A protein has these predicted regions:
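Conserved GTPase G-domain substructure that encodes guanine base recognition and part of the catalytic core
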Residues: 1-166
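Membrane-inserting effector segments that mediate pore formation, membrane fusion
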Residues: 155-190
């Protein structure tokens, strides 16, 4: 495959889902071909400012207020429905906050652990080793706040290890096959 994974990041502060939906439906999904639902992730960034007003984000808990969560879930439902109606493809968008620090104010990330888990899970096992070797933030606050629907940090580690073990197994198998060219002793060494 030429493209393993497409991550579509939608600006949560915009009301215009039509442009993103059109891009997903008319360009991205047709380009992905088979099993495109396994190779596309849709994430709405800036969830903290998606809904306007003072009741949009609980700064103390660093999570959406109940009103904001309803608003974001409606946005996700609309996006899912529009993509499904146009392509018959079921996607599972998420919302998150990347976080920022501008010198005066700081917004901690939210749901980044979930986004990373989904990226790793949608990446072919044999390519997860590359992600495991990548430099990810070591600040625990980056991965702390999420929707608590799962232990995304542990599940990400498990997925990465699954990819590493799978790659080691495949490498050993390949080595044995190459070694067989030199007889049974070569196969054992390979």
């Amino acid at each position: 495959l030429l493209i393993d994974l497409v991550l579509v990041v939608i600006d949560g502060s915009t009301r215009d889902l039509g442009t993103a939906t059109q891009l997903i439906n008319e360009l991205i999904i047709p380009s992905l071909g088979e099993k495109s639902n396994e190779r596309i992730l849709v994430a709405i960034n800036q969830a903290d400012v998606a809904m306007k007003g003072g009741n949009a984000w609980d700064r103390k808990l660093n999570s959406p207020t109940p009103e904001s969560a309803r608003f974001l879930n409606e946005k996700i439902a609309s996006l899912k429905q529009r993509v499904f109606e146009a392509t018959a493809l079921a996607i599972e968008p998420i919302y998150y906050v990347a976080g920022y620090h501008d010198g005066k104010q700081q917004q901690r990330p939210y749901n980044l652990s979930k986004l990373l888990f989904l990226i790793v899970g949608h990446t072919p096992k044999n390519k997860r080793v590359i992600l495991a070797d990548s430099t990810l933030s070591t600040k625990t606050s980056t991965w702390l706040d999420d929707d608590r629907r799962s232990n995304y940090n542990q599940r990400t580690r498990d997925s990465l290890w699954e990819g590493i073990v799978d790659s080691i197994h495949n490498g050993a198998e390949l080595g044995a096959n190459i070694g067989l060219a030199f007889g049974s002793a070569g196969g054992a060494v390979g």
